[in-house]
């Protein structure tokens, strides 16, 4: 877990040193949160294969406070679009219990970068709908080394999926947070 340029630098340096001392292939190191990184840090994460795992709902809920407390650096709060531009897989999470596990609100926040007051922050850090959906499905599975079993619907996988009442890729954007889960399936069985 690291939030802000100084802690993020510490994690990047530690991972770089660990890999230098004991090289491993396909380790998929993560930095949970990874808010407010510099462009240089994003480049280093891409180089080292470090995957940031931000919580886009926090942009909606807390960016106003970040502007008040930290100033313009709040524009870089959870910059998923910058990660994608650097070739880093975009993985998203909720940070329960700090915020509710509302996937569709989080996707909307990552796409719109809109705060609770309606302010748009760091528009260049936004991602598109497909990237947001992949951030909660296959990319999340990959960062956990579980893409062989979950993250997409394919023959041979566990058949873990949800049925929702609309299409997150085509629904009117401001209706995205209103989508509802109608069924959850685990291992090919409704639960």
Where are these regions (language model features)?
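Unchanged
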Residues: 176
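Histidine-centered catalytic micro-motifs
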Residues: 1-5
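His/Asp/Glu-enriched, well-ordered alpha-helical/loop segment
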Residues: 6-29, 33-34, 40-43, 47-50, ...
């Amino acid at each position: 877990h690291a939030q802000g340029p100084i802690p993020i630098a510490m994690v990047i340096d530690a991972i770089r040193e660990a890999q230098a001392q004991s090289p491993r292939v396909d380790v998929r190191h993560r930095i949970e949160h990874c808010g407010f990184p510099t462009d240089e840090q994003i480049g280093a994460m891409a180089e080292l294969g470090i995957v940031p795992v931000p919580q886009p709902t926090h942009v909606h809920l807390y960016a106003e406070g970040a502007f008040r407390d930290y100033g313009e650096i709040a524009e870089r709060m959870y910059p998923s679009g910058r990660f994608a531009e650097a070739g880093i897989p975009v993985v998203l999470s909720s940070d329960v219990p700090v915020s509710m596990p509302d996937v569709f609100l989080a996707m909307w926040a990552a796409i719109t970068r809109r705060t609770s007051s309606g302010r748009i922050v760091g528009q260049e850090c936004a991602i598109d709908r497909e990237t947001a959906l992949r951030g909660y499905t296959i990319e999340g599975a990959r960062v956990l080394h579980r893409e062989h079993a979950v993250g997409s619907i394919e023959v041979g996988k566990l058949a873990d999926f949800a049925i929702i009442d609309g299409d997150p890729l085509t629904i009117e954007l401001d209706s995205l947070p209103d989508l509802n889960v109608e069924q959850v399936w685990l291992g090919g069985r409704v639960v």
